[in-house]
Amino acid sequence: MPLNVQDKKAIVADVGAQLAGAQTVVLAEYRGIPVEQLTKLRASARDQGVYLRVLKNTLARRAAQGTQFEPLADSMVGPLIYGISADPIASAKVLQNFAKTQDKLVITAGLYNGKLLDVAGVKALATIPSRDELLSQLLGVMLAPVSAMARVLGAVAAQKAAGAPAEAGTEANETPAAE
């Protein structure tokens, strides 16, 4: 059933609003994927905060017109599913993870930070850890010296409480004998 002009305007406005707040767009061909698999992909995308939609390419081009995503217009050919996200890597990660299990999903292009990405670029973007993962790694690195110091102080306190002899570190505090 063809869309009327009002429906097309609503779609362009909706996609345009998503693009306005997005950092990344990834395009993938979905030809031959069963509906239940696409439903799983949509649920996964929703969980990751990715706007995932099958669009007519002319409507997608019109929505991208005048935005940083306009360079993708040449890549908008064939039956495509569009992954749009404010998170720099979420859309690439969702589509790449799904493509690992579903051979018929073929990533064709992407755009991040105003730069057009080929298939290899999208795959590289998908391998970057998420912001939360990076923050937890940074926190682990920052807390490692503190926790190591706490373990050492705890061990010294336990030794003193048990009446064990002091470690070699106390000998260094003594003044050397004059010759």
Swiss-Prot record:
InterPro entries: Ribosomal_uL10, Ribosomal_uL10-like_sf, Ribosomal_uL10_bac, Ribosomal_uL10_bac_type
Pfam families linked to this entry: Ribosomal_L10
GO process annotations (BP): translation
Molecular function per GO: large ribosomal subunit rRNA binding
Keywords noted in UniProt: Ribonucleoprotein, Ribosomal protein, RNA-binding, rRNA-binding
GO CC annotations on file: ribonucleoprotein complex; ribosome
Purpose of the protein: Forms part of the ribosomal stalk, playing a central role in the interaction of the ribosome with GTP-bound translation factors.
Subunit structure: Part of the ribosomal stalk of the 50S ribosomal subunit. The N-terminus interacts with L11 and the large rRNA to form the base of the stalk. The C-terminus forms an elongated spine to which L12 dimers bind in a sequential fashion forming a multimeric L10(L12)X complex.
Family: Belongs to the universal ribosomal protein uL10 family.
Protein name: Large ribosomal subunit protein uL10
This protein's encoding gene: rplJ
